[in-house]
Amino acid sequence: VTLKGASLDNSRSGVISAKGAVDIRTGVLDNSRNGGIGSNAGITLVAARLDNGQQGRVSAKGLLDANLKGLDQRGGGVLVSETGVTLDLNGGTLVNRDGGLIATPGALLLRQLGAVDNGAGGEISSDRAFTLAAASLDNRGGRLIGAASLTLRIAQALDNSLAGVISGAAGLSVATGALDNAEGGQLISQGVLDVSSADLDNRGGALSGKQSLRLSAANLDNRGGLLTSDGELELTAGRVDSADGGEISARGDLRLTVERLVQRQGRL
């Protein structure tokens, strides 16, 4: 199936389905409100903008290749492939909040992302290693899951508060500007957890690297928060406030290089 045009409205339970490949090239593509685009082979989407929100669904058994300038998946939109997903936003915005899902057991290639909103139950996941590089990332209450390793490169701010979860099973590397991991935020890995940020707010949050944890931050607020590793833990920061039940712990070597440490009713 090949469709070309200035715009395409497949919303309100519209269906585009094929046993073979689906190729859609248009301006604005509206697949919202239970719209469905499916293929037993691959799907290619080229559009200025894709509205896949309110339970829209794009699913392929083969490769799913989407070249867009904006993607809105809020309200349960689904973008999935059994083989692999390539998503190029050309600097545009990705909205995947409120239950949006981007997932594949195969390779997940995310290119030229601008601002990313994956909050309030949004999920971006792959069974393979993947990298998410973006201008900013809002993952408040969202999930970023790498069943292998996960790399985040965020130019501005990363907000993982309100029980956000960022996990790379084999390893997690995060480089960002300001990082908010407060109020139940979790950065976790069964391997090495490596975090580099400007100011880090970890009040009531947790950073856990089972193999090791390396953290470098301009300043760290760890009041009521947890930094922990079953291996070694290395912390480099300016001012560190780990009072009020904050904990910094390691079963292996613990190395702190800080300008000032506040530890009232904290644990080290």
What are these regions (language model features)?
Residues 11-16, 32-38, 53-59, 73-80, ...:
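Short, T/G/N/S-enriched strand-turn elements that build extracellular solenoid repeat scaffolds
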Residues 1-5, 20-27, 41-48, 62-70, ...:
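Well-ordered beta-strand segments characteristic of repetitive beta-sheet solenoids
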